[in-house]
Structures are given as C-alpha cells and as structure tokens.
Amino acid sequence: MRELLEKIAAEGEVVADGVLKVDRFLNHQVDPHLMKRIGEEFAAQFHRERPTKVLTLESSGISPALMAAYELGVPLVVARKRRPLTMTSEVYCAEVYSFTKKETNEIIVSRPLLDSSDRVLIIDDFLANGQAALGMVEVVRQAGADVVGIGIVIEKAFQDGGRLLRSQGFRVVSLARIASLSDGVIRFHEEVMS
C-alpha cells in the first residue's frame, strides 16, 4: 500500500536494530485518514472470505482492526491482556510473547463473543515473530471457529513470523513489508501492494 509505505518512510524511525517506531501515525498518535485507507484495503483483500468477526489484540491493533471491521460491516473483538472486573463469563485464553516489550502476556476473549459459526479475520499492527497472531489463532481455535485470514499493517519480513504463519497455511496479507531495519535505515521488501 503505497500511502502506508510513504508514511513509514517519512515518519517512521528506527530506534534499534529490528525496532521501528511509528507512533506518529499508528500506535500512539493515529492518522484517521490513513486508518480509513488501511481498513478499505483489508476489506478489499478479505471480503471474499466472508468474515463474520475481526479479532485483534489490544491496544495498537485496535485502530486498523476497527476500520477493517467497519468496512466489512462486522463486529470487532479485542483480545484483552488483563481480565477486567466486568468480564464475568468464561474465557478463551492463550499466552503471547511480545517482541517489543520482551514479556509474555495471557490474552483473553470472553466466550460469548466467539463461537463455532464464526469466520474470523485477524488484524494486527505489526508482525515480527508471529507470536501475537498465533495466540489469536489459538483463541479462535478454542472457540471452534475458523481463521479466514490474517491482515498485518507492517510485517518485519526479516523475522520469522510471516514465514511461520504462511507455512501453517494461513493467508497473510501485509500492507507494508520491511526487509531490514539496520544501520538506522528502513528498507522495504520489493513486493509492494498498490
């Protein structure tokens, strides 16, 4: 997605080898026009799979996932990292390791929000080692539902997550693929989605 690539090139910042800071438009301050375009692109890519729900992990995946759900006309389910007092029902849960925070979290989804009839599209802001996506896949499987695709805003193609998910048969659509983040330079993968 050319608009996203241009935004990353202009406003993204390499803060360490393998770490890309995009807090000016994606995960701290959010560019609503860009999120709308991202939602439209994910909807265009996945509408044939007829998802009934979009699933993301709090908190940085919420903006692009909400716009995708809006464009698809389906509910958004947000997997939580902590169980709030208001979550009184039984839950689906899985452990997820965060590459950025270097910690393991348990993610949870209230059971009434997913069931075996659901066709779930997973959306997330980043794909690095694939652990967040695999945790969400596990939650969907616990519900007996189907994962119909995985949409990623920014994939770190130099890490194993994309290969891991694709090797398991998942259709993964990444709107921007980063080839490397070394020496303070953002290098994009040659494949560019319009």
From Swiss-Prot:
Catalytic activity: XMP + diphosphate = xanthine + 5-phospho-alpha-D-ribose 1-diphosphate
Domain of life: Bacteria
SUPFAM superfamilies hit by this protein: PRTase-like
Gene3D superfamilies, A to Z: 3.40.50.2020
Major place of residence: cytoplasm
Keyword Cytoplasm: yes
GO process annotations (BP): purine ribonucleoside salvage; xanthine metabolic process; XMP salvage
Pfam families, sorted: Pribosyltran
Keyword set, alphabetical order: Cytoplasm, Glycosyltransferase, Purine salvage, Transferase
KW Cytoplasm (keyword) present: yes
Enzyme Commission code(s) on record: 2.4.2.22
Binding sites annotated in the UniProt record for xanthine: L20, N27, K156
Recorded family membership: Belongs to the purine/pyrimidine phosphoribosyltransferase family. Xpt subfamily.
Function comment: Converts the preformed base xanthine, a product of nucleic acid breakdown, to xanthosine 5'-monophosphate (XMP), so it can be reused for RNA or DNA synthesis.
Assembly notes: Homodimer.
Name the record gives this protein: Xanthine phosphoribosyltransferase
Organism: Geobacillus thermodenitrificans (strain NG80-2)
Gene: xpt
